[in-house]
Curated annotation (Swiss-Prot):
GO terms for cellular component: acrosomal vesicle; cytoplasm; radial spoke; sperm principal piece. GO terms for biological process: gene expression; single fertilization; sperm flagellum assembly. It is found in: Cell projection, Cilium, Flagellum; Cytoplasmic vesicle, Secretory vesicle, Acrosome; Cytoplasm. Residues 236-271, 309-331 are annotated as: Disordered. The modification Phosphoserine is found at residue 34. Disulfide bonds: none annotated. Keywords: Cell projection, Cilium, Coiled coil, Cytoplasm, Cytoplasmic vesicle, Flagellum, Phosphoprotein. This is Cilia- and flagella-associated protein 119. Residues 286-317 form a coiled coil. The keyword Transmembrane helix does not apply.
């Protein structure tokens, strides 16, 4: 009877302990999931903060975007910027009315106030006039303007020189509209039209490539700094109180030159030891090179003097006839 009661009691106790362990495991799993979720949220927030900070830094620092982005893949650009309705509007206008309609279609602000907008408008106006002179269709004119605009974007993507990359990109896009190979390229232009369009872009845009880059890209300056291995950079000596007082006295003398004051000369600043050693080394090397050059010059001067003296002695000798020719025949 006791054994049955004890076994029942032990079974109930083990069951309660198992239930307690399962509850602890559930709570631990919840805590772990919450910890992982918070960690993921913190990582996401840190990533977003880092990306926003990097973007802000790139916007503030003009040198962050110094290197050019990769050029896009050459693709068919028909109806890319000027669609069918836009081309019909331009077709109805004359050369004088074209500027206003084109400024509205390209969403240019005020060409009279903005130099860049005026240059862009002139670029596309002359391109449209060229297309009219060549007798291009609406599709060909739209593709030519889109090709020129993509080339202009590739040019102004960086302030550095990328004329070779832009020319390769231009020829690749040009061939996308001259060879029938769908969906990669179409035969929109004939061979003569392709050659005429290439000559026009080369003689107009690529001829003034640096001018477009100068106007549409920020100015970049490259500063050169030299550092010597094994030497620390020179430290700026702090101004002492005597130097501050002397500067004040000099200012007072400039304001009131009639008052006589004692002139004080600031003691020369002691040079650091490593700079003195470097200057001494440079002086010795320069003196050695100068001595070698002086010796070479003296040797060449001596050799030239000897050659001149030998020539002079040869000229000063009396002219002697060869034997047999100077004797007269006796009868």
């Amino acid at each position: 009877m006791l054994n049955r009661k004890t076994s029942h009691f032990l079974g109930m106790r083990v069951q309660s302990e198992l239930e307690h362990l399962s509850e602890l495991r559930r709570e631990a799993g919840k805590d772990r999931s919450s910890v992982h979720g918070s960690a993921a949220r913190t990582r996401a927030s840190v990533r977003t903060q880092w990306t926003t900070a990097a973007a802000a830094k790139a916007d503030e620092d003009p040198g962050a975007n110094l290197f050019p982005p990769p050029l896009p893949r050459p693709r068919i650009c028909m109806w890319k910027y000027l669609d069918v309705h836009s081309m019909h509007q331009l077709e109805k206008t004359t050369n004088a009315e074209m500027r206003e309609v084109l400024a509205e279609l390209l969403e240019l602000g005020c060409p009279e106030q903005s130099l860049r907008d005026a240059i862009t408008l002139d670029l596309f106006c002359h391109a449209l006039i060229f297309c009219r002179q060549q007798g291009f269709s609406l599709e060909q004119t739209s593709a030519a303007c889109a090709l020129l605009q993509d080339l202009h974007k590739a040019c102004i993507a960086t302030p550095l020189g990328n004329v070779e990359e832009c020319y390769r990109y231009f020829t690749s896009v040009l061939f996308c509209h001259g060879v029938r190979r769908p969906p990669f390229s179409i035969d929109l232009f004939k061979e003569e039209q392709l050659l005429a369009l290439e000559d026009y872009v080369v003689n107009t845009y690529f001829r003034h490539f640096k001018l477009y880059k100068y106007v549409f890209t920020p100015q970049v300056r490259l500063d050169l700094s030299l550092t010597y291995m094994g030497l620390q950079p020179p430290k700026l000596w702090p101004e002492s109180e005597t130097e501050k007082e002397e500067s004040k006295e000099m200012e007072e003398q400039a304001v009131t030159p009639q008052k006589e004051e004692l002139e004080t000369v600031a003691p020369p600043e002691p040079e650091p030891s490593h700079i003195h050693v470097l200057r001494a080394y440079i002086k010795t090397q320069v003196n050695k090179e100068l001595e070698q050059l002086q010796g070479l010059v003296e040797e060449r001067l001596k050799a030239s003097e000897e050659r001149l003296s030998s020539k002079l002695t040869a000229l000063e000798r009396p002219f002697q006839l060869p034997p047999g020719k100077g004797k007269s025949k006796t009868k």
